[in-house]
Amino acid sequence: MKNFALIGAGICGLRCAELLEKGGLTVQLFDKARGVGGRLATRRHERWRFDHGSPSLHGDDDKWLTCISRYPKWTSGDNSMNTHLPENGVNQMAKDHASQLNVQLNCLIRSIERSNEGWHLLDEDGNPYGPFETLIITAPCPQTQMLIETLETALLQQLKDVRMTPAWVMMLVVAEPLIATHQLCPNHSLIRRISAEHSKPGRALDPEEHSYVLETTSEWSKQHEEDSPAAVEASILSALMRITTTAVNPMHCAVHRWRYAHTENPLGRPYLIDPQLKLAVTGDWCLGDGASSAYRSGELLANALLDPEPDDVRETQHFR
């Protein structure tokens, strides 16, 4: 039976692995995090839950809509979007997809090597994995580039123009409402979006508790990527008070940095394959439109490997 190693258990990697397994292949996933999902992330603190990566599940792709429509609807404020949310948070979707997969968490793959036997992986503690016949990498593009930089592959040249940007997010609980809608995207140089977490399905709080996730703009985040959490917290709170024109007295406040939050310049195609090395790379940075594009890229790559269309035969024939 053909065996695959797949680095990255975000929704792109999970969807790809799910379809490969259904096609009769064996897939071992590796992820450096404590849980699956990547930016489909939900953080819990006491009785509060915060979707501090992707704020919701939305998009127009038919297959993606079929997938997310199993979850309750959420009116984010933009009635043009089909927006859904699991009651336990966006991370629940990733958990649902991972439930039947073999995922090794807390495992940071530091190096990869191709031999006559296949792919060999080494984690940060020196533990080896392999050999695997085929390797798929769904990590953020800069991390993918670092993993494959020692290989003789044309993929490196094809990835050179992809650009990803960071984002800081704040998880905030206050006694008074800050915005009148479920979500606000102010025209502001620092704050990109404010999401009312307490308005989401299954998250009704005490009437005197209002929880929010605030995300900073890409431009501000690039300029302040290496600032301390305390400095970022002070800057966001100051900007928030100017936007709402009210005093903000946090009951809870924490910030988190996503180093690779958004794609400024996407690849423009759903995946890349090096058939000689039996190596494929994909991720949300390929099409660059969040979770729905990540899901689509993972699905298209899996389909190409399982049942290539005529245009894909040349690329995938060495995988068969």
How would you describe each model-predicted region?
Residues K2, D125-T134:
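Core beta-strand elements of the Rossmann-like FAD/NAD(P) dinucleotide-binding domain
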Residues G37, F132-L184, T246-V248:
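Central helical "cap/lid" subdomain
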Residues S56-K63, S76-A98, E226-S235:
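Short beta-strand to alpha-helix junction loop
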Residues L240-L277:
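Flavin (FAD/FMN) cofactor-binding core of flavoprotein oxidoreductases
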Residues M171-H224, A231, S235, A239-T244:
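Active-site substrate-recognition segment that forms the wall
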Residues A5-I7, E18-H45:
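Glycine-rich FAD pyrophosphate-binding loop
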Residues M1-C12:
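Beta1/beta-strand and adjacent pyrophosphate-binding region of the FAD-binding site
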Residues L105-H120:
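A conserved short coil-to-beta-strand element within the FAD-binding core of flavoproteins
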